[in-house]
C-alpha cells in the first residue's frame, strides 16, 4: 500500500485546513437531507389543511437541534464515533398520517394544532429512546445486539433508504440538467480525482453545480416550470438573527400511537449505523 492510499486513523494527522474542508463536505452532505424533513412535513400539512403550519418544525430549529444533538452525542461518545445526528425520514409517514386525520378531535383542526399533536408523539418517541438507553446501560450492549444483528438492522436501513427514492426523484426533477451536473461531478472526482480532491467529491459536486446554477441564473435561464433557478428574495427579507415561533406540544393517544412506534425502526437504523461506523474506525 503506497503512502497516498494509507488509512488515516487519527484525523489530526491531516492538519487543520484539510480537516476544515472535510468538515464542510460533511456539512453539505447532511444539509440537504436535514432541511428536507421539515420542508416535506410542512407540505403534508399544506396538502391536508390548506395551510403551512407557522409553528412546529422549521428549518432553523431543525438545524440547531441537529447540531446541538451531534455535539452532545460526541461528548457522550468521548469523540470516538465520527457520526452526525440529523433528521430521520422514518417519521415522515407519521407526520403525513397525523396531518390527514379528520376524525374525532382532529376534525376541522388547523395545521398548527395538528403539528402540535404530531410533535407530542415525537416527544414520546424520544422518551422511548431514553428507555432503550437505560436498558442498554443495565444489561449491556452485547445482550441487546443479540436481538439486533446486521441481518435485522441492515434491511431496516435499506427500506428507509429506498422509501426516499421518490423524494430524490421529485427534487431532481426541478432541474434535471443541474442534477445531472452534480451527479457527474461527484462520480468523476470519486473515480478520477487525485489527492485531496478524491475524498471531497460531494463538496466539489455542490460547488461546481452551484457555480453552473449562478451562470444559468445570470443568463436568465429558468427551471422547466418557469421559476427562477436561484431565488434570494427570502434570504434578503429575513433577519440575520431571530427566534423561531414556539409552540407547546399537545398529547393525544391517536397521535402517540402513530408517531411513537416509529422509534423502534429508527433505533434499529441507529444501531446499524453505529455498528457500521464502529467497524471502520
Could you tell me what each predicted segment is?
Residues 1-60, 202-281:
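Helix-loop-helix hairpins and the membrane-proximal interhelical loops
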Residues 66-87, 136:
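Juxtamembrane transmembrane-helix boundary signature
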Residues 44, 99-108, 136-137, 273-281:
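Helix-loop-helix connectors at the membrane interface of multi-pass transporters/channels
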Residues 37, 64-67, 86-102, 155, ...:
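Hydrophobic alpha-helical segments within and immediately flanking transmembrane helices
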Residues 50-60, 104-121:
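Membrane-interface alpha-helices at helix entry/exit sites of multi-pass transporters
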Residues 31-47, 92-107, 159-165:
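Membrane-embedded alpha-helical segments in integral membrane proteins
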Residues 17-33, 53-61, 77, 81-90, ...:
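Helical membrane-embedded segments and adjacent short helical loop/helix-boundary regions
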Residues 100, 113-220:
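Membrane-embedded alpha-helical modules
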Amino acid at each position: 500500500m503506497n503512502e497516498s492510499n494509507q488509512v488515516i486513523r487519527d484525523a489530526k494527522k491531516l492538519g487543520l485546513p484539510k480537516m476544515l474542508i472535510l468538515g464542510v463536505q460533511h456539512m453539505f452532505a447532511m444539509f440537504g437531507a436535514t432541511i428536507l424533513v421539515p420542508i416535506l412535513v410542512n407540505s403534508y400539512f399544506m396538502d391536508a389543511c390548506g395551510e403551512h403550519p407557522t409553528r412546529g418544525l422549521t428549518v432553523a430549529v431543525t438545524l440547531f437541534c441537529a447540531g446541538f444533538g451531534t455535539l452532545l452525542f460526541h461528548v457522550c461518545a468521548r469523540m470516538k464515533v465520527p457520526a452526525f445526528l440529523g433528521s430521520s425520514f422514518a417519521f415522515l409517514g407519521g407526520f403525513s398520517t397525523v396531518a390527514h386525520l379528520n376524525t374525532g378531535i382532529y376534525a376541522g383542526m388547523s395545521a398548527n394544532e395538528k403539528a402540535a399533536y404530531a410533535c407530542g408523539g415525537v416527544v414520546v418517541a424520544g422518551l422511548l429512546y431514553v428507555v432503550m438507553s437505560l436498558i442498554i446501560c443495565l444489561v449491556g450492549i452485547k445482550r441487546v445486539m443479540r436481538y439486533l444483528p446486521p441481518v435485522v438492522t441492515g434491511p431496516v436501513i435499506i427500506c428507509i433508504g429506498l422509501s426516499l427514492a421518490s423524494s430524490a426523484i421529485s427534487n431532481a426533477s426541478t432541474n434535471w440538467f443541474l442534477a445531472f451536473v452534480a451527479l457527474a461531478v461527484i462520480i468523476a472526482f470519486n473515480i478520477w480525482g487525485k489527492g485531496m480532491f478524491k475524498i471531497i467529491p460531494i463538496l466539489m459536486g455542490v460547488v461546481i453545480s452551484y457555480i453552473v446554477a449562478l451562470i444559468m441564473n445570470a443568463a436568465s435561464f429558468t427551471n422547466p416550470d418557469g421559476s427562477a433557478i436561484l431565488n434570494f428574495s427570502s434570504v434578503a427579507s429575513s433577519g440575520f438573527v431571530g427566534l423561531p415561533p414556539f409552540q407547546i406540544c399537545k398529547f393525544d393517544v391517536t397521535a402517540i400511537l402513530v408517531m411513537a412506534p416509529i422509534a423502534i425502526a429508527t433505533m434499529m437504523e441507529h444501531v446499524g449505523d453505529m455498528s457500521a461506523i464502529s467497524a471502520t474506525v
